């Protein structure tokens, strides 16, 4: 049967890649519908045209991004030159001065470069990122990705505010409004305490097969041991590092605000991007050190959450007023396939189970399921995500790539949907590290099972991408519609760790707003007094209202 004539006319008048003008017959439709037609027309015009459309599409939040991995290689090289650091041409890494041969002063890689200096500069950018990487026998994308951090790392915090500014500026340019940055605060004191006072449950005494679900690690008796160990660490002064950890964030935020001229008439657009922090715990250390660092993380986050004074570690860059704690949650990081990470996985989830009972208000997001067949034995693919949800109390899962290898995967998907456990989807990272892409990725399976998902970049500097790139990739690879993209953006803020109630009456159901804000245009400039009072009392709802305002502004263009 031939399509109706008006559809043929609309097709003939379809949007051009240059202007994205909506067909005349669609201009009387609702703004959402007009934007959807423009989106489809841009898709038909090809990836470059769709990139233009998606660049200014409101994206809400970026929830899975490591600060060190978010910075582009060029920034690290420039800062190394400013700091008088050296370059090791053989290792393609930065080094401390003096720059005696074979080391080369990083300053030689700025200004007018000789051909040799340009070649070294290019090799450094490649070594600090996935640019141009081609896997070879014995050196995979996984190896390249994680080796980059050793090459540009260990440089102190002098430029931390510049790194946050780089992330916020990029976010503002592509219409993001909120970012949760993962960062590892200092924990040398906690690590030393753990080394001098090892945890009684030493998993190194167990056999190497201890990553299986029936592992003897972390049995019920460990809970009492954790309680005793927690108190011992407190008695030995574990809390002494908390002020320094919070000051690190405060100083970075202050430097960022200065760079962006926030609060002045010259304020940069990045000032409007809210930034919060997730406390990274390194999972590749012995049990006592992991527990001590996690314990310090929970204490630091709780202290930040409890802080109500103007010297709180969190300043929203736009006006400098204290809004909410700098640290809003905790995450476990480092390669999940590492020996200790695999051996101690259940034990570490038991640690989180105990610490959650002591600090129930601290938010938890966990890297889990960043694994693929062949990377570890099959037994290692069968329980990480489930244990992160059920033992680790994860509200969000980072990656979740091996979910269909989990024992009773359909049941796990149902459980995640029922509990509204969101999955942070990192498409480019998963391809680069695990070689998983397209139909092999579980992204569409999560969506089909009604598990909430949102897009994120993981390490946009290392991967040489941005969040728009991930939206473009998802749109093309999985044939997403315009309203699918809106749901992804809304889901990101719905599952952010911002304080307060959601704008929406039911979790992950973006149809009916909370009672206080019903019967009025969402995202309007003048919410009712009752709605305004509700928004003023909830950071999350206020951010969600702003997202709806941005949708209205974006869709009004079509």
Indicate where each model-derived feature is located.
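Bacterial N-terminal signal peptides that target proteins for export
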Residues: 1-9
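Membrane-interface motif at the C-terminal end of an N-terminal transmembrane signal
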Residues: 19-25
